[in-house]
Amino acid sequence: MGTTEATLRMENVDVRDEWQDEDLPRPLPEDTGVERLGGAVEDSSSPPSTLNLSGAHRKRKTLVAPEINISLDQSEGSLLSDDFLDTPDDLDINVDDIETPDETDSLEFLGNGNELEWEDDTPVATAKNMPGDSADLFGDGSAEDGSAANGRLWRTVIIGEQEHRIDLHMIRPYMKVVTHGGYYGEGLNAIIVFAACFLPDSSSPDYHYIMENLFLYVISSLELLVAEDYMIVYLNGATPRRRMPGIGWLKKCYHMIDRRLRKNLKSLIIVHPSWFIRTVLAISRPFISVKFISKIQYVHSLEELERLIPMEHVQLPDCVLQYEEQRLRAKRESTRPPQPEFLLPRSEEKPETVEEEDRAAEATEDQETSMS
């Protein structure tokens, strides 16, 4: 009996396919299906396979998410209703006080994520040193690329789109050769101080290896310290001949300097120039541009240097200060006028001298008398 009744019901049911055009099912529209069925009575004894279209169940049973009213009012179902807020204090929300992520947070998120990978192990050196505190421009050595079994520290730098490794263990005693001397003018116009007295002795073992790594250190330091225009103060005083850099080393430095650094160099001040440095620059003219030669300026004293640049942050080595003092002392002695010879008065001459002159005069008179 139940099967026959279900069959009669199905003949009058308008079946609508809800799965043809959409991926997700949607509830059937509420229509008056009960009236067309003539007010069918619910049969509680019907098997689960029958289609129950009684008045109590007018829609197809679907699983849907709970409805949430995403609004800022306190209506029922809203995010600000009592169902979601625990205390009345939580209801006092100012939209202007809501913090939104900025660019810094985004960068921190990217930096901590796994999507970004280093192409190499090149560390980034930060120029946080204050002017003059550049004995080790790359830090205290704790962030080196690695250390070999013999305890050497290495630094990887990129110069001219080429990767180089610097042996910091070998050049650590000579790192004071280049320091930051502050700024001049307006903006970040840096003063780079190069003290030749801190260069290694040519008779030291591994001299060429040290100079090779020291050269890379100087070039990479310039790229770290220079932001805009800059000048180089070359302290040549108190530097013995055995510590003077060779022509080949200077030539290599010039060619390895980036074009931006060469262009932004406004002046090369050579303090206490010697005949050797003048000769080196004269020999180097064929491979040095005319513009670079025009930027060279000779300064013969620290007093003259002080009139050109601010000296607040320029660290002068003790040997350079002593050399300046010796030059000033020698200059004062050379310009001192000669003292006149002291002549004794006639009355203070010795009596023997007077007697000898009297005897000579008497002998002359006797000769004249005898001749007459």
From Swiss-Prot:
GO cellular component annotations of the record: axon; cytoplasm; dendrite; growth cone; mitochondrial membrane; neuron projection; neuron projection terminus; perinuclear region of cytoplasm
Major site of localization recorded for this protein: other
PTM characteristics: Cleaved by CASP3 and CASP7. The potential C-terminal product released by CASP3 cleavage may inhibit the ERK signaling pathway through MAP2K2. May be ubiquitinated by STUB1.
Spans traversing the lipid bilayer: none
CDD domains (UniProt xref): SEC14 (cd00170)
Tissues in which the UniProt entry reports expression: Neuronal tissues specific. Strongly expressed in brain. Expressed in virtually all parts of the adult brain, including cortex, cerebellum and olfactory bulbs. Enriched in hippocampus, cerebellar cortex, deep cerebellar nuclei, and pontine nuclei (at protein level).
Site, Cleavage: residue positions: 105-106
Any GO molecular function: kinesin binding
Domain notes: The CRAL-TRIO domain is known to bind small hydrophobic molecules.
Reported disease: Defects in Atcay are the cause of jittery phenotype, which is characterized by severe truncal and limb ataxia and death due to starvation and dehydration by 3-4 weeks of age.
Quaternary assembly: Interacts with KLC1; may link mitochondria to KLC1 and regulate mitochondria localization into neuron projections. Interacts with GLS; the interaction is direct and may control GLS localization, negatively regulating its activity. Interacts with PIN1 (via WW domain); upon NGF stimulation. The interaction with PIN1 and GLS is competitive.
Annotated protein name in UniProt: Caytaxin
Organism, as annotated: Mus musculus
